[in-house]
């Protein structure tokens, strides 16, 4: 079910959709685009028909159903340019629901006059994580592929695009909407790790194609930071105290290695100062009143930094247990 918050009047909107996937390329690209250009949310997809809970959660002995993933539509009105509709899904549904979910979304954006759409995806390649990733395109329309060539985007000759970032394009074609996927190269050995450089190159191409005028310097800084951390962590994992430059094509990292890198990247993530101050405020409140711990946990999860604060968060409960035991 899609609930409309408002009904904007849009002119020939281009539709862009994304879900989480390899390297977080698609998801992070759309998050950046939405925040950088000030898109306004106008509808919410409540995907209860497409997601089923796999378990229930327990909090202080009380059982409850988990919140199901949702998706949000937002829009941007532009002068003398086609407007844009964005859709950002919080998670991909089981494969058997992918086509039905795609139809629901496509039918909705057609109502607003969308006749073309874009998705993003990762293209794993045997490249170094500091290499400048190429951008490829696959489309339902030959003319679009030719229009993309001047921006350094190469046509994908063969392959497949898995998940909703690909499936929705097939549904769009069936519904009369031209669909194109932009794929950013990422290293084989870091498919589970955020890759802002791939997102940056995709958005650079998109910005040129749609005349967006994006400032991508924040992604450039984030790319440098993550690449340096991967260098240090790969060196540490390989047992090198003074990590030498990573080989051009390193061997794939194990799941444990990837988990370690993810945790370290989370620990070093640069939150805005205002957010850190708000988190510290929640900690102080929770020390006085444990009912505030739920709000603290939600804030940590929202910013994806729970692991950074996990020990301190759990210490709140240990301290409470000791105080109860002393009474």
Regions found by a protein language model. Give the residues of each.
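N-terminal short beta-loop-beta anion/metal-coordinating cradle
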Residues: 1-89
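Short acidic (Asp/Glu) patches
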Residues: 65-72, 96-106
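Short amphipathic alpha-helical interaction elements located at domain edges
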Residues: 290-327
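Ordered, amphipathic secondary-structure segments that act as subunit-interaction surfaces
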Residues: 80-104
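Intrinsically disordered, low-complexity linker/tail regions enriched in Pro/Ser/Thr
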Residues: 174, 201, 205-273, 324-327
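Charged/polar low-complexity intrinsically disordered segments, enriched in acidic residues
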Residues: 254-305
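Catalytic cores of processing enzymes, dominated by hydrolases/peptidases
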Residues: 126-209, 226-247
């Amino acid at each position: 079910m899609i609930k409309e918050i408002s009904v904007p009047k849009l002119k020939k909107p281009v539709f862009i959709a994304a879900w989480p996937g390899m390297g977080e390329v698609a998801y992070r690209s759309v998050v950046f685009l939405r925040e950088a250009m000030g898109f306004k949310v106008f509808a919410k997809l409540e995907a209860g028909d497409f997601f089923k809970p796999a378990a229930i959660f327990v909090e202080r002995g009380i059982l409850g159903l988990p919140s199901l993933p949702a998706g949000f539509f937002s829009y941007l009105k532009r002068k003398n340019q086609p407007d844009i509709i964005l859709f950002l899904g919080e998670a991909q549904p089981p494969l058997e629901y992918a086509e039905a979910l795609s139809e629901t979304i496509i039918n909705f954006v057609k109502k607003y006059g969308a006749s073309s759409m874009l998705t993003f995806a990762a293209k794993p390649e045997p490249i170094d994580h500091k290499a400048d990733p190429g951008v490829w395109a696959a489309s339902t329309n030959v003319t679009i592929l030719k229009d993309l060539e001047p921006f350094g985007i190469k046509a994908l000759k063969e392959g497949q695009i898995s998940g909703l970032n690909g499936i929705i394009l097939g549904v769009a074609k069936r519904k009369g909407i031209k669909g194109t996927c932009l794929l950013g190269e990422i290293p084989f050995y870091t498919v589970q790790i955020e890759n802002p450089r791939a997102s940056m190159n995709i958005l650079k191409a998109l910005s040129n194609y749609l005349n967006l005028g994006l400032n991508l310097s924040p992604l450039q800084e984030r790319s440098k930071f993550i690449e340096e951390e991967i260098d240090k962590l790969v060196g540490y994992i390989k047992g090198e105290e003074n990590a030498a430059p990573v080989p051009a094509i390193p061997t794939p990292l194990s799941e444990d290695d990837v988990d370690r890198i993810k945790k370290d990247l989370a620990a070093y993530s640069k939150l805005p100062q205002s957010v850190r101050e708000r988190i510290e405020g929640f900690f102080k409140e929770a020390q006085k009143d444990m009912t505030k711990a739920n709000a603290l946990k939600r804030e940590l999860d929202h910013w994806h930094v729970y692991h950074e604060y996990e020990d301190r968060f759990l210490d709140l409960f240990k301290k409470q247990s000791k105080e109860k035991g002393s009474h």
